[in-house]
């Protein structure tokens, strides 16, 4: 496919502004831009319809990049699977550069995986440290997965994502039904907190700590085999159901 570029730029004494249009068969991308001495502002316009909207700002002195993206629908597999472009960029170590400084936020109400919706993903890179903060996604209409204190680290040439995920249960009856939890194990749960380490190279999870309603599970070695069998973001519902039921069997709350 041929790619066409069309520009409409007005140069002024203190600023430059206009549009840059990229087009190919069945697709147009129109950027509105404005440049001053030390800032560049850019955004999409309504020609993209409701599928995608973005706006951003580049500060030149000192350098800082800000970007907000709102998408009508997100393919979660293409975003976080081990073979995705996003994950390949993370593995490339490009973010570990002291000259980079950025904040990127991604929002989408619809996810193409039927069990998830309302994604908010926020990332911040500063001083050679990549952090995911304020990131959350809904599990249907009965739970929220909230990621906090998540940081991308390099250790002995391996790339790790360290952090904590909170499973906030908003409707325990629907939650238990979804995971087919036996009635004898259905307890009055509100929050399950898991501190973890995820190796992006080998797709292996390690669990450092588990809490249920702020009560620490002292010994979860009985879950080690099941946790080691997790295949990163390709983990399926059956594997998670097995781990959850074993965890609830050990919980005396």
Language model region names:
Residues 1-253:
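Membrane-proximal interfacial segments on either side of biological membranes
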């Amino acid at each position: 496919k041929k790619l066409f570029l069309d520009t409409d730029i007005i140069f002024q004494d203190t600023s430059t502004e206009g549009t840059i249009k990229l087009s190919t068969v069945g697709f147009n991308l129109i950027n509105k831009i404005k440049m001053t001495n030390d800032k560049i502002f850019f955004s999409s316009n309504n020609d993209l319809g409701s599928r995608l909207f973005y706006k951003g700002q580049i500060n030149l002195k000192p350098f800082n990049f800000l970007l907000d993206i709102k998408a009508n629908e997100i393919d979660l597999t293409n975003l976080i699977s081990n073979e995705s472009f996003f994950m390949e960029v993370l593995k490339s170590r490009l973010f570990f550069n002291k000259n980079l400084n950025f904040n990127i936020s991604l929002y989408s109400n619809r996810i193409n995986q039927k069990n998830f919706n309302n994604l908010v993903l926020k990332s911040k890179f500063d001083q050679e440290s990549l952090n995911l903060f304020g990131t959350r996604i809904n599990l249907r209409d009965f739970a929220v997965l909230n990621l906090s204190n998540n940081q991308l680290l390099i250790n002995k040439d391996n790339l790790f994502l360290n952090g904590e995920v909170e499973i906030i249960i908003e409707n325990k009856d629907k939650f238990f039904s979804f995971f087919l939890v036996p009635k004898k194990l259905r307890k009055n749960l509100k929050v399950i907190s898991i501190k973890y380490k995820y190796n992006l190279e080998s797709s292996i999870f390690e669990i450092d700590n588990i809490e249920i309603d702020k009560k620490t599970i002292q010994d979860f070695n009985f879950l080690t085999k099941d946790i080691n069998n997790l295949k990163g973001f390709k983990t399926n519902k059956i594997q998670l159901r097995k781990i959850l039921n074993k965890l609830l069997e050990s919980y005396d709350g």
